């Protein structure tokens, strides 16, 4: 057996580390363990196994003075070696694990270098993923640097920050100016009291809601009385025809309360207030007005005075009270 082994392994068995062969287990008298321990002759499968080992050792090419030997095969084939890793030189498999790295400088009695055989190689356990080639190490460092660069925010200069603040201030001023212009337009369409200071936005919205509700109720109440003809809407101080000329139509008039038409009285809640400038929306049948005297009644919407917390919008029926500027 020694002759056969030396024929395939010129360097002898000394080149194998203790992790592959144990001297006590290899040379034993118990024939029940391994047929290689007999020493008389090798069986056919044992000879094939030795040839496979020799072929595998020569298959591991030695590059840059270092090579990678994988872990030994399962116990069923203790002397077989797995094929080389696809990870490249000095790189462990993706699955991790402790392979065997080998380097030059085998102990005396190792494999002599020859053109047909690899240089001497000393196997030792690798540290798994910790054993990386310089190329893999460089790739890892470059990836970490790129990730850090992506996370790093660009530091703006003081001039850039000042420009950003100025742009934000300009946008805010324009936004507030547009809101103020919209409220001014709303105030111009709502009959309000002559107040010594401009109405706030809350008061403007409250008056607008009350005025819109009043006009909506008035239109709903006038639907059964209106004719089929189209009418118009009077502007400030004027009136327009909204109903048809049917004989059964009733004269309707909308009067925005005009203060000061009645004699002032100290008991009047509106005493001392200047007259309210408003507009009148009126429509009636002109023929009926010419033929007979008609008593006109109308709903009156009085705007809420912001100075009076307890006052609310009121709806009154005023009889024979002329509007602010009545146009018959």
From Swiss-Prot:
CDD domains per UniProt: bHLH_TS_PTF1A
UniProt-annotated stretches for the region Disordered: 259-278, 305-328
Molecular function per GO: chromatin binding; DNA binding; DNA-binding transcription activator activity, RNA polymerase II-specific; DNA-binding transcription factor activity, RNA polymerase II-specific; E-box binding; protein dimerization activity; RNA polymerase II transcription regulatory region sequence-specific DNA binding; sequence-specific double-stranded DNA binding
Gene Ontology terms: biological process: amacrine cell differentiation; cerebellum development; developmental process; exocrine pancreas development; neuron fate commitment; pancreas development; regulation of DNA-templated transcription; regulation of neural retina development
Keywords carried by this UniProt record: Cytoplasm, Developmental protein, Diabetes mellitus, Differentiation, DNA-binding, Neurogenesis, Nucleus, Transcription, Transcription regulation
Compartments (UniProt record): Nucleus; Cytoplasm
Membrane-spanning parts: none
Pfam families cross-referenced by the UniProt entry: HLH
Coiled coil location: none
Tissue expression remark: Pancreas-specific (at protein level). Loss of expression is seen in ductal type pancreas cancers.
Location, primary (coarse class): nucleus
Described function: Transcription factor implicated in the cell fate determination in various organs. Binds to the E-box consensus sequence 5'-CANNTG-3'. Plays a role in early and late pancreas development and differentiation. Important for determining whether cells allocated to the pancreatic buds continue towards pancreatic organogenesis or revert back to duodenal fates. May be involved in the maintenance of exocrine pancreas-specific gene expression including ELA1 and amylase. Required for the formation of pancreatic acinar and ductal cells. Plays an important role in cerebellar development.
Disorder association: Pancreatic and cerebellar agenesis: A disease characterized by neonatal diabetes mellitus, cerebellar agenesis or hypoplasia, severe intrauterine growth retardation, the presence of very little subcutaneous fat, and dysmorphic facial features.
Anything else known: An excellent marker of acinar cell differentiation in the pancreas.
Subunit-structure text: Component of the pancreas transcription factor 1 complex (PTF1) which is composed of TCF3/p75, TCF12/p64 and PTF1A/p48. TCF3 is responsible for the nuclear import of the p48/p64 complex. Interacts with TCF3 and RBPSUH/RBP-Jkappa.
Protein name: Pancreas transcription factor 1 subunit alpha
Organism, as annotated: Homo sapiens
């Amino acid at each position: 057996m020694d002759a056969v082994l030396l024929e395939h392994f010129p360097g002898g068995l000394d080149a194998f580390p203790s992790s592959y062969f144990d001297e006590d287990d290899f040379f034993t008298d118990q024939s029940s363990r391994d047929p290689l321990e007999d020493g008389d002759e090798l069986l056919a499968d044992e000879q094939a196994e030795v040839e496979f080992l020799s072929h595998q050792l020569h298959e591991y090419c030695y590059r840059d003075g270092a090579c990678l030997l994988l872990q030994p095969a399962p116990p069923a084939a203790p002397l077989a070696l797995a094929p080389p890793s696809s990870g490249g030189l000095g790189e462990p498999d993706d699955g991790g694990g402790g392979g065997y790295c080998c380097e030059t400088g085998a102990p005396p009695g190792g494999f002599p270098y020859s053109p047909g055989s690899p240089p001497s190689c000393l196997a030792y356990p690798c540290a798994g993923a910790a054993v990386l080639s310089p190329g893999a190490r460089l790739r890892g460092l470059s990836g970490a640097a790129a990730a850090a660069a992506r996370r790093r925010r660009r530091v703006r200069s003081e001039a850039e920050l000042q420009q950003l603040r100025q742009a934000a201030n300009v946008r805010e001023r324009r936004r507030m100016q547009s809101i103020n212009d919209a409220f001014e337009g709303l105030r111009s369409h709502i009959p309000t009291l002559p107040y010594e200071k401009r109405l706030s936005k809350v008061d403007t919205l409250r008056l607008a809601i009350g005025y819109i509700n009043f006009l909506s109720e008035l239109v709903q109440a006038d639907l059964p009385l209106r004719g089929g003809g189209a009418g118009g809407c009077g502007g400030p101080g004027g009136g327009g025809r909204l109903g048809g000329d049917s004989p059964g139509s009733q004269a309707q008039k909308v009067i925005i309360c005009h203060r000061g038409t009645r004699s002032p009285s100290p008991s009047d809640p509106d005493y001392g207030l200047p007259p309210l400038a408003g507009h009148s929306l009126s429509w009636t049948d002109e023929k009926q007005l010419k033929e007979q005297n008609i008593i006109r009644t109308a709903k009156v919407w009085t705007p809420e005075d912001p100075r009076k917390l307890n006052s609310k919008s009121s709806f009154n029926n005023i009889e024979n009270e002329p509007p602010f500027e009545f146009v018959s």
